[in-house]
Amino acid sequence: MSNSKKLTKKELLEMYDKMLLIRHFDMELSKLYSRGFIHGMTHYSVGEEAANVGAIYPMRKEDLMYSNHRGHGQTITKGIDINKMMAEILGKSTGQCKGRGGSMHLYNLEVNNMGCNGIVGGGHGLSTGAALAQKMKKTGNVVVCCMGESATNEGSFHECLNMASIWKLPLIFYVINNKYGISMSQQRSMTVERVVDRAEAYKVKSFRSEERRVGKECRSRW
């Protein structure tokens, strides 16, 4: 993560630029999807721009990121050729993954974006293993695993959180809570009101942030 804890005017403008890019990219993508140009499912980051940029922007190029099925905003923030990203989602051979990954399997190894994952909770084990490798190699790099609140209901979340706590791994589980897993509300799928409280059971440091403050708080804490 970046060593500086105070955001400069230049950084704030760069973050705003990223948020605008995410919004316009996904809005254009929505139009293409409605016209039948995109095969399969695609999940937009509209409304979550600040949550994505605020958390991912402070990362260094060397830090590793594992995203989820709703990874457009995180992928754009970490860094990618926007034309290759669009081509990938459209299934073109000029895409980042030659058109074979699509919306839910974007990646860019040049900036250590280790890939999005179409399986809910699919990044838990991958990111935990990567964090263990970073610790063993003493790289000083941090691993960030992005997910929605429903992914914290998966058994792998609790297993990996427990292992990360025991081994003191350089791993951040970043949860964007939009209150719903498809059509299932948080109230019907879990008894905790604050998802962040789940970390306390494993003695893992945690904090909760409102979207409009996430950039400032992630920079100061990470």
Task: For each feature predicted by the language model, list its residue ranges.
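Cofactor-/ligand-binding subdomain signature composed of acidic, glycine-rich
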Residues: M1-H39, K61
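Short, proline-centered helix/strand-breaking motifs
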Residues: P170-I172, K205, E210
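A positional/architectural concept
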Residues: L161, L171-F173, N177
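Conserved catalytic cores of soluble enzyme domains
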Residues: Y180-M184
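Short, ordered loop/turn segments at secondary-structure junctions
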Residues: R70, I176-K179, E211
